[in-house]
Each structure stands twice: as structure tokens, then as C-alpha cells.
UniProtKB/Swiss-Prot annotation:
The gene is mdtD. It comes from Escherichia coli O6:H1 (strain CFT073 / ATCC 700928 / UPEC). The chain crosses the membrane at residues 12-32, 49-69, 77-97, 102-124, 138-158, 165-185, 197-217, 225-245, 263-283, 286-306, 342-362, 396-416, 431-451. Its main location: membrane. GO terms for cellular component: plasma membrane. Belongs to the major facilitator superfamily. TCR/Tet family. This is Putative multidrug resistance protein MdtD. The keyword Transmembrane applies. Residues 1-11, 70-76, 125-137, 186-196, 246-262, 307-341, 417-430 are periplasmic. Pfam families: MFS_1.
Length: 471
């Protein structure tokens, strides 16, 4: 990339900072949740919605981001994304109640949903095709550093300042990013087809209402009749989308995607698999802080080995899948992740804290292998004319399943916690133990889906071609 013009390199730096802000924010909040609960006068069992409100908003808004960038221009949308994300961060820091914080996180999510896909689109437009991979490697590197720094930085800020600072640090970075975007980034536009607003609204209502119904079943004031009504509305919205998308060339996601068996299996497995694995980044720091008295900073440090294991495994996952095949790798890593989850719980309950970093490192390795395999299995056999639509649907499903996973984790904590009157340390650990056992069972379930994957090892060379689009 040394032969690129200075202006292009500056534009890549802008995109890289956007990736960093978005990836940092997805992990920095986790270690601060118990402190937020105490400050806002809420039960820690309700704080999962701080994560869900952000991730669910990202899932809902993702389908519109690419169309908006083509229609309005990448500079205008990227600038808007940074401004919304920064304003959301400010409102998060100023929040005095949980409801205010949830609304601010949703505003952040609107910005976050546009930041990464529009950033990818920007790189495609400003960099020659032969240098695209090198440019994407450059701009995504800060996105890999964000999860590494996020938990420890969040714990450090909470312990030595306050939880408000995990949002305030976004403001100067966002201001600089917004100004440089206006000054340096060209406003590329493309001719677009008419946006499928009806399909977008049906999907948005279906996802949001079903997630709300799932969370409402935890005893948050919804009556059984209201929950049943929400479920009915959500199901009807999704069924209407399926009817709307039939033989509709303008549909957000073509139903032709599901004619490819590996896409259908991969998408179903990704949805079920990320529900289970999406619980872990939320539950682990909460488990360590509330169950065992770890400080926020110490709990954040414990997350670093998991990220390191994930990053290290990415270098050899292609060789592993090509050697053993998708079916064996996905079944083994799914069951392995369930076992590692039980190992983490057992190690913590026995008080072997010095072993926890090694267990978390192993968990990161297994999880990374499964993620990469799920992504590439889903996309590898799609025809070129459906690859972009399939990738967008996979991205949306990834965010949606993570929000459902965090919601279910909060539901399990509330369910087991409500069965105990006392709040001594032994009871708290018992509640977490039952929750962890349930999580391990949920994590193992997608193995039944992956067992149906064709044993086509000779086709696994496609992983090297599709991996870039699935990141």
C-alpha cells in the first residue's frame, strides 16, 4: 500500500478509526455492567438490556446501511454514522436511569450499524482491486485490537474513574473522525434500485418484537397475554416478509438463497451457535465480579487470553478445515466449546483462579475456529449474484442471535435467582452454576444441525476464497 496517494491512506485511517470505535464499544461495556447497575439503582440481572439494545439496533439497521451509502454517498453516511455514534456515547454518559441509557445505546447502535459496512464499501471504492485485501487487512486491524483492549480498559475506567468514562472516551475520537471525514473522504454515490421499505419494516418489527417478548417473559411487568400478543405480532411480521419476498426481485433478501443447502444449514447453525456463544462475553465478567468478587479491572484482564486465543487461531483455521472438513470441525468445536464452558465454571468454583486464563485462551481458540467455519460454510457455495445478499443476511443474523443470546442469559439468571431468597456468596455461586450448566447445554445444541452438513472435504478450498467476505 506504500504506492497509494497520501489522501487515500488518510481515508483508510478514517475507516480504521471507525472500525476501532465500533469494536471497542462492543466489549468495553461488559465489565462495567455491575457498576452501572449499582449507580443506576438497578439489579445486575436487568443490565443485559444495555448490550441487547445496542446489538439489536445494529441488526435491525444493517440491511439499510449499504443502500443508504450508495444513495446518499459514502462520506455523508459515514459522517452521519460517526456523529450518531458520538452523540449516543454522550447521551449514555449523561443517562440517569436505565431507560435513558437504553435509548442512548439504541442511538449508538444506529451509528454502529452504518459504520462498519459503509467503511468496507468505502475501501472498495477508493482502493484498486489488486490492493483491496491489503487495505482491508490494514483497516480491520484496529477492529481486532478493540476487543483486546475493551474489557481491560472498561474495567480500568470503572475502577479508577466511573462507568461514564467508557462512553466519554468516544467523544474526542468521534469529533476528530467526523471532521476528517468531511475534509478528506470523497462522497461516492451509485445508482440504486428502489429500497424495499416494506420488507425492511417487516423484518425490523419481527426481530424487535420477538426479542422484547423474550425479555418480557423474565418478569419485567408484561402480562402473559401481552407476551403472547408480542409473539403473535413478531411471528406474523416474519411470515408476511416471507410472503412479500416470494418472486420479489426487490426484496431485501432473496428466498433463492435458501436453495443452496450449505447456506441454509450454515445460516441455521450460525443463528443457533451464536445464541450460545453470544452469552459468554456478557456472562464471564459478570460471573467473575458478582460471583467471586473480582474487581472490574481484574475481570477485564481475564478476558484478554480469550481474545488472544481467538486471534492466534485465525492463522491456521483454513488448514484445519481443509484437513478435517466442515462437518467434523463444526461438530467438534461446538461440543468442545460446551465442554470448555463447563471447565471454566468448574475451575472457578474450585477456586483455581490461576488456571482460568488458560481455560479462556482455549475457549477463544475453539470459538474462533467455529466462527470462521460457520461463516465460510454459509457463503462458500452461493452463486456470485447472491453472494452480497447472503453476506448481508449472515451479518444481520449474527447480530440478532447475539442479542437473543444475551437476553436468554439474563433470563436464566433471573429465573434461577428468583428461586433463592438469600443473597450470600454461596447462593450467588449456585445461581451462576445453574445458569452456566444451562448455557453449556444451549451451546451444544447446534451440533445436531452441523451433523447434517455434507462431508465434502474436497470442496473446503472455498474457505480461502470466501473468508474475506465473511469477516
Amino acid at each position: 500500500m506504500t504506492d497509494l496517494p497520501d489522501s487515500t491512506r488518510w481515508q483508510l485511517w478514517i475507516v480504521a478509526f471507525g472500525f476501532f470505535m465500533q469494536s471497542l464499544d462492543t466489549t468495553i461495556v461488559n465489565t462495567a455492567l455491575p457498576s452501572m447497575a449499582q449507580s443506576l439503582g438497578e439489579s445486575p440481572l436487568h443490565m443485559h438490556m444495555v448490550i441487547v439494545s445496542y446489538v439489536l439496533t445494529v441488526a435491525v439497521m444493517l440491511p439499510a446501511s449499504g443502500w443508504l451509502a450508495d444513495k446518499v454517498g459514502v462520506r455523508n453516511i459515514f459522517f452521519t454514522a460517526i456523529v450518531l455514534f458520538t452523540l449516543g456515547s454522550l447521551f449514555c454518559a449523561l443517562s440517569g436511569t436505565l431507560n435513558e441509557l437504553l435509548l442512548a445505546r439504541a442511538l449508538q447502535g444506529v451509528g454502529g450499524a452504518m459504520m462498519v459496512p459503509v467503511g468496507r464499501l468505502t475501501v472498495m471504492k477508493i482502493v484498486p482491486r489488486e490492493q483491496y485485501m491489503a487495505a482491508m487487512t490494514f483497516v480491520t486491524l484496529p477492529g481486532q485490537i478493540g476487543p483486546l483492549l475493551g474489557p481491560a480498559l472498561g474495567g480500568l475506567l470503572v475502577e479508577y474513574a466511573s462507568w461514564h468514562w467508557i462512553f466519554l472516551i468516544n467523544i474526542p475520537v468521534g469529533i476528530i473522525g467526523a471532521i476528517t471525514t468531511l475534509m478528506l473522504m470523497p462522497n461516492y454515490t451509485m445508482q440504486t434500485r428502489r429500497f424495499d421499505l416494506s420488507g425492511f419494516l417487516l423484518l425490523a418489527v419481527g426481530m424487535a418484537v420477538l426479542t422484547l417478548a423474550l425479555d418480557g417473559s423474565k418478569g419485567t411487568g408484561f402480562s402473559p397475554l401481552a407476551i403472547a400478543g408480542l409473539v403473535a405480532v413478531g411471528v406474523v411480521a416474519l411470515v408476511l416478509y416471507l410472503l412479500h419476498a416470494q418472486n420479489n426481485n426487490r426484496a431485501l433478501f432473496s428466498l433463492k438463497l435458501f436453495r443452496t443447502r450449505t447456506f441454509s444449514l450454515g445460516l441455521a447453525g450460525s443463528f443457533a451457535g451464536r445464541i450460545g456463544s453470544g452469552m459468554l462475553p456478557f456472562m464471564t465478567p459478570v460471573f467473575l465480579q458478582i460471583g467471586f468478587g473480582f474487581s472490574p479491572f481484574h475481570a477485564g484482564l481475564m478476558m484478554i487470553p480469550m481474545v488472544l486465543g481467538s486471534m492466534g487461531m485465525k492463522r491456521i483455521v483454513v488448514q484445519v478445515v481443509n484437513r478435517f472438513g466442515y462437518r467434523r470441525v463444526l461438530v467438534a468445536t461446538t461440543l468442545g466449546l460446551s465442554l470448555v464452558t463447563l471447565l471454566f465454571m468448574t475451575t472457578a468454583l474450585l477456586g483455581w483462579y490461576y488456571v482460568l486464563p488458560f481455560v479462556l485462551f482455549l475457549q477463544g481458540m475453539v470459538n474462533s475456529t467455529r466462527f470462521s467455519s460457520m461463516n465460510t460454510l454459509t457463503l462458500k457455495d452461493l452463486p456470485d449474484n447472491l453472494a452480497s445478499s447472503g453476506n448481508s443476511l449472515l451479518s444481520m443474523i449474527m447480530q440478532l442471535s447475539m442479542s437473543i443470546g444475551v437476553t436468554i442469559a439474563g433470563l436464566l439468571l433471573g429465573l434461577f435467582g428468583s428461586q433463592h431468597v438469600s443473597v450470600d456468596s454461596g447462593t450467588t455461586q449456585t445461581v451462576f452454576m445453574y445458569t452456566w450448566l444451562s448455557m453449556a447445554s444451549i451451546i451444544a445444541l447446534p451440533a445436531f444441525i452441523f451433523a447434517r452438513v455434507p462431508n465434502d472435504t474436497h470442496q473446503n478450498v472455498a474457505i480461502s476464497r470466501r473468508k474475506r467476505s465473511a469477516q
